[in-house]
Amino acid sequence: MTRVIHTGDTHLGYQQYHSPERRQDFLDAFERVVADALDGDVDAVVHAGDLYHDRRPELPDLLGTLAALRRLDDAGIPFLAIVGNHESTRGGQWLDLFERLGLATRLGRDPHVVGGVAFYGLDHVPRSRRDELDYQFDPVDADRAVLVAHGLFTPFAHADWETETVLAESNVDFDAVLLGDNHVPDTAELDGTWVTYCGSTERASASERDPRGYNLVEFTPDAVDIRRRTLETRPFAFVEVDLAGDEGIERVRQRVREFDLEDAVVIVELRGEGETVTPAAVESFAVEEGALVARVNDKRDIDDDGDLATDVTFADPDDAVRERVREMGLSSAALDVDETVRASKVADSNVRDEVRERVESLLSDDPDAFVAAERESDAEAEESESVEDAADGEDAAAVEDTAETAAEAATDTDTETTADTDSETAADPAASRDSSLGDFA
């Protein structure tokens, strides 16, 4: 039997709600996965992409990653991973550097065999480039074959990548496809191949209300067994307030007090009618009551005059902007420029030069990046949880220098972290495998 942890969408470095504590929460969740691996007698940790939230993780995020990977390496547990859309760069990938340090294996066309199971990888590929993929791999004599991929695959919600096509065109018959990108965990069977999303390890948006976690996957000669494990993460309090015509801030405060707010992220959703409620007043009240951070979603109707009946704020303004940009159907190059302009890590005085360099680089290396993407329907854009980021023009040598500096500075410190690993329902896997699925790396 071969037993692996299937995780992904850890989004290290995400300073959600501009909170340093939330940034640390994402690293803490990843460390809990590692702790579970050390305690759980697993043969490997498989990461399905989006290790980082963006292409330029900062030094504390790199140091935390290196420390966690060294703990796995010291225990003889391989870390197998692919590159997701959030962290993908135009030059060298962070994962490549971790591999050079002996702390990770980047999966691709060539198999990496663990306990009789051959693992292959398929990095995230923008839709505009998928016609170039041939889904051909290097077959190997192994008991089982597994593809690890990042993208929105069928038969799950918001899909734009046909799993059936990958399976049909691949020269390897896969027993399972371990996926990342969709933050909602789910499992399905396609013609004898098990396809599963592990979900995110922390709540990357206010819509992710269910407990976070990962998959524990066991491969035996007769079956593929997929079980859900939950992680202990920072509590979120989702406060829904239905206001009557004469109700306002006092009713909202009363409702907020009904929840345990200690160190929680509080999301207040206003519905119904009622008086004007200033979001800032609600948010500051929740913080005074013990919350780490609070946000308000005012979803009340527009009045008869066509004006907004109340002030409106978003639970996560960054997510709202990304969602609107996604709806616009911009080209990869335009998305890259948008990210540069909005990136907090690029000084205002350097934005013009940075944009010019990226445009010149894309014109030289990837003219197709200026072709607009197919616009999604409003319904798809409203629900979709991932944005197809453009390839980064960052210099690979700079990436390497930063990673090696982090490697030298990192210390192998054992972090005392534990996780609640409540076993949820198990998929009812079958032993048969008819079709398969392929990769490009």
Swiss-Prot record:
Binding-site list for Mn(2+) 1: D9, H11, D50, H183
Cofactor binding mode and count: Binds 2 manganese ions per subunit.
Lineage: Archaea, Methanobacteriati, Methanobacteriota, Stenosarchaea group, Halobacteria
Top-level EC class: hydrolase
Region (Disordered): 360-441
Biased composition (Acidic residues): 379-403, 411-425
Database matches in PANTHER family: COMPONENT OF ATP-DEPENDENT DSDNA EXONUCLEASE (PTHR30337), NUCLEASE SBCCD SUBUNIT D (PTHR30337:SF0)
Reported regulation of activity: Nuclease activity is regulated by Rad50.
Assembly mode: Homodimer. Forms a heterotetramer composed of two Mre11 subunits and two Rad50 subunits.
Functional summary from the UniProt entry: Part of the Rad50/Mre11 complex, which is involved in the early steps of DNA double-strand break (DSB) repair. Mre11 binds to DSB ends and has both double-stranded 3'-5' exonuclease activity and single-stranded endonuclease activity. In polyploid organisms, the Rad50/Mre11 complex appears to restrain the repair of double-strand breaks by homologous recombination, allowing another pathway to act as the primary mode of repair.
Cofactor: Mn(2+)
Record-stated family: Belongs to the MRE11/RAD32 family.
UniProt: Mn(2+) 2 binding residues: D50, N85, H150, D181
E.C. code: 3.1.-.-
SUPFAM superfamilies: Metallo-dependent phosphatases (SSF56300)
One record GO biological process: double-strand break repair
One annotated GO molecular function: endonuclease activity
Superkingdom of source: Archaea
Active site positions, chain numbering: H86
Keyword field: DNA damage, DNA repair, Endonuclease, Exonuclease, Hydrolase, Manganese, Metal-binding, Nuclease
Reported phenotype of the disruption mutant: Mutants are more resistant to DNA damage, but recover more slowly than the wild-type.
NCBIfam families for the chain: Mre11_Halo
Protein name listed in UniProt: DNA double-strand break repair protein Mre11
